[in-house]
Structure formats: structure tokens, C-alpha cells
């Protein structure tokens, strides 16, 4: 009997389709995304100024706003008009008076300086100009401040090239570690199994020297 050959791209697409179908029955995000642990890793406190880079729908922005309090400031960054509109609507709807929505670019989040921390949640793999973005974030952080990156883990054994992984919305953490170091960050923590279910996600904590 002739063996059936299945391409890696086909299998990956099938896995993504299965994941999309499974998403209909996923538990609420608050039960698995581990937002409190992400904030703990950032080591931020009330009254501080932090950035949510590629903030998306603003899921983590709400947690950051509560953490830094009314005397702190959260800069929620997005690029597309649609995402910026969604963030502004969230800020208005939830009365997040300590959140400022910023329109960034693919290479520059347009952040103010001397920030006490920054985070990129589930979006690092989407950044096509990651080195320029990391450099800009580093310059916006005060010395000693932390950048926390959380993203989807690549499916083991299917794709090794960075671009192939990113096109399937995942990334091997080794690429992020290398890129963070190239941008001048120090790696202070790496958790390859930060989240196991329903999605495999890693977390890297990097410090601006």
C-alpha cells in the first residue's frame, strides 16, 4: 500500500481549522490567559507608566489600568484604524481615564520616554519589523524596566523557519530571545510552557540595562 504524503502546510492548516472549531467551546479568556501572572512578571505598581504594545482589543489594557491606578498611566498602542477605534471605544465604555490610545507604526510605537514597563501579548509574531520595534520600545523604557512578551508556541516539528511559523500565528521562543538580545535587552526569565491549555504559549521577560 502506498503511503499517504501530507504536506506540513496542509497539516498546519488542518490544525488551525480544528483550533478555530474548538474556540467555540473555549473557557472564558480570564480563566486561561493568566493576566495576573503577566502583570506580576512586569513588576509594576500603582502610579507607574506602562505600555501595552499591539494592544488589540484591549484585553490586557484593562488589567494594566487597574494595576497602575488613577495616578498611573497606560499607553495602549495599535496601528490600524480599526484596532485604534476599538481601543478608543473600550476606553470610553469602561471609563478608563488613565489610558491613552496611541497610533503607532510598524517600526515605532510612538511611546513617551521613561516608562516603567511594557508588554506585547499574543502579537509579537505579527510584527514584520520586530527589530525596529524592539529598539523603539527599549528607548522608551527607563533603565532597569522590563518588557514582557507572551506569544503562541510554534507546533513542534512542522516549521523551523521564522517566517513560516509567524504566518501560522506562532513562534519558537528562541527567535524572540535572539531578537531581544540583538536589540540590547537582557533576558531575565523564560517560560516555554507559560500556558499549556487551551493554547500553548510562552513568556519571556527582558530588561533594559
PLM ranges: what are they?
Residues 31-46:
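Conserved alpha-helix/loop element of class I SAM-dependent methyltransferases that forms part
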Residues 65, 131-146:
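A short glycine-rich, Lys/Arg-flanked "PGG" loop and its adjoining helix->strand segment in the class I
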Amino acid at each position: 500500500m502506498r503511503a499517504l504524503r501530507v504536506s506540513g502546510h496542509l497539516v498546519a492548516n488542518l490544525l488551525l481549522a480544528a483550533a478555530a472549531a474548538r474556540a467555540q467551546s473555549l473557557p472564558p479568556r480570564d480563566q486561561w490567559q493568566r493576566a495576573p501572572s503577566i502583570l506580576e512578571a512586569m513588576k509594576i505598581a500603582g502610579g507607574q507608566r506602562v505600555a501595552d504594545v499591539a494592544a488589540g482589543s484591549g484585553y490586557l489594557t484593562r488589567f494594566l489600568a487597574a494595576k497602575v491606578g488613577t495616578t498611573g498611566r497606560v499607553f495602549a498602542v495599535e496601528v490600524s484604524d480599526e484596532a485604534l477605534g476599538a481601543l478608543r471605544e473600550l476606553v470610553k465604555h469602561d471609563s478608563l481615564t488613565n489610558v491613552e490610545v496611541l497610533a503607532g507604526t510598524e517600526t515605532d510605537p510612538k511611546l513617551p520616554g521613561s516608562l516603567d514597563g511594557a508588554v506585547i501579548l499574543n502579537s509579537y509574531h505579527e510584527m514584520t519589523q520586530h527589530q525596529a520595534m524592539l529598539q523603539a520600545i527599549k528607548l522608551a523604557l527607563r533603565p532597569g524596566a522590563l518588557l514582557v512578551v507572551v506569544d503562541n508556541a510554534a507546533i513542534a516539528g512542522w516549521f523551523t523557519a521564522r517566517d513560516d511559523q509567524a504566518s501560522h500565528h506562532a513562534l519558537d521562543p528562541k527567535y524572540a530571545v535572539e531578537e531581544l538580545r540583538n536589540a540590547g535587552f537582557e533576558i531575565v526569565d523564560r517560560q516555554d510552557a507559560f500556558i499549556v491549555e487551551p493554547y500553548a504559549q510562552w513568556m519571556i521577560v527582558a530588561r533594559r540595562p
